[in-house]
Amino acid sequence: MKKLIECVPNFSEGNDMHIIDQITAEIKAVEGVSLIDVDPGKATNRTVVTMVGTPEEVCEAAFRAVKKASELIDMKKHKGAHPRFGATDVCPLVPVSNITMEETVEYARALAKRIGEELNIPVYCYENAAFTPERRNLATCRAGEYEALGERLSSEQWHPDFGPRELNEWTAKTGATAVGARNFLVAYNVNLNTTSTRRANAIAFDVRERGRAKREGNPITGKIVKDEKGKNVMIPGTLKSVKAIGWFIEEYGIAQISMNLTDISVTSVHEAFDEVCRKAQDRGIRVTGSELVGVIPLKAMLDAGRYFLRKQQRSTGVSDKELIKIAVKSLGLDELYPFEPRKKIIEYILEDEMNQGKKFLIDMNLHEFADETASESPAPGGGSISAYMGALASSLATMVANLSSHKRGWDERWEEFSNWAERGKAYQVELIKMVDEDTNAFNRIMDAFGLPKKTDEEKAARHQAIQDATKFATEVPFKTMMFCYECMEVVKAMAEIGNPNSVTDAGVGALAARSGVIGAFLNVKINAAGLDDKEYANDIISRGEKVVEMAKQMETDILNIVNSKI
């Protein structure tokens, strides 16, 4: 799985789209990065840009954008309603999928260092990327804004983490930049069956982390209680990492709870929704749906789908499409307008952009796939078919698990079978990927053979490319073997404890999985034969032989179980 991060740089220009277009063109020029949104603000004279991609590519795109902004924006002339201290005012990195905050911090600090050293721009690291606790808060780093920058740059306490520590002709033009690492922020509104902003605010105060001011006597009209420093004493709300207010939206004719979920690993979308439902019900108000503003990581939607299925005591071993559908319907995300997953889920947006114009075997229907296999084209071949057999084996195992989870009289065992279904589904997903991966590996070998070979240098480069491609084409079917064999554990469990009416389906799953193992191993052997590295080739063949023998034994064991029950 690819690591994905989001980057949300804020540029101190919101009126001249010619400048903004030049900055965003730098981002678009980096392969592997998707420009999600460009949001200029005239009053703030500021544009918020959102991009997503793999970490290295996003950092490269961010660097190029910061460089272009430093060339085009003159902070000496800047005026706007929003706090700012640089041409690129802030540049936070946000982990999206398959990457930790700790890794994101390292990328943020590396980006900050590069901006400071190569562009000679003062850089402050904030939030999780901060080197000291007092610099975690962006407002503290930006105190006094651009106008106070000259004094702060040379200050012992507030000099930048990277870049020049003086205000000269260049830094006076560029200002400073704050580079940070923060959690993904989800802007999320919950719809109410009321037009009352006051009642919506009451619910917002119930749930938001900050809560509401403590009062003497009457909780609504009583005098606000102050602490020894004269600040309001607050009664915390029920949800951590949540900011919320109530408002009335004239366009929809309803009041909403407008929330910023600042850390969805602490309070998820579905947890926030359910808590608002509870607090609204306490006040005689009904939640009718919700609205997602902006984009959301795939995991957040899948987690929501699983959460609502578990509440129903239903199996969660279903497709991503089904989980998203459950999430949308349960949260009422389609109440105000249709919810389009391909335009709202970050990974899907990036996937569609990266795969534009490409054709995939897994997108074909059964007739098309069979015809493509039967054609005179050498791919897809046995490797892709082996992977697909494994995918069908895990699909059958998952089907038996789901049928068992929902079997009448087995209600108390729903979670046991749901867990098996999730495992089976995970293998199916991986093996489906291997269908195209195997064909891609074959095509990579063909591309390597097509390289020029006129000079000695070209011949050497071509030979190395062939070796690299052949090694990759050996590793791909070996991964297929392992997935096929590992999924047999789910098949066996379903033969043993699953719905007895479906035991023969488990048997067919065993046959398909074993065939997937042996078929993939044939590809391992034929590709390994072309490797110069005989030690590696012999090792992978030896390991493959052991997997084949284990798969054959597992098939025998499963079929014995199946035959004993029919």
What are these regions (language model features)?
Residues 356-365, 371, 479, 486, ...:
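Polytopic transmembrane helical bundles with strong interfacial aromatic enrichment
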Residues 388-392, 420, 427-434, 473-483, ...:
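Amphipathic alpha-helix face/heptad-repeat signature
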Residues 111, 121-125, 134-138, 487, ...:
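Preference for long, well-ordered alpha-helical segments
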Residues 406-452, 547-556:
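A structural-propensity feature for long, helix-poor, extended segments
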Residues 1-368, 375, 453, 461:
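Long, contiguous binding/interaction regions
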Residues 184-186, 438-511, 515, 527:
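Amphipathic alpha-helical interface segments
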Residues 7-9, 85-92, 373-400, 501-520:
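Conserved phosphate/anionic-ligand binding catalytic regions in large, soluble enzymes, centered on
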Residues 65, 369, 395-399, 441, ...:
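Amphipathic, well-ordered alpha-helical segments in soluble domains
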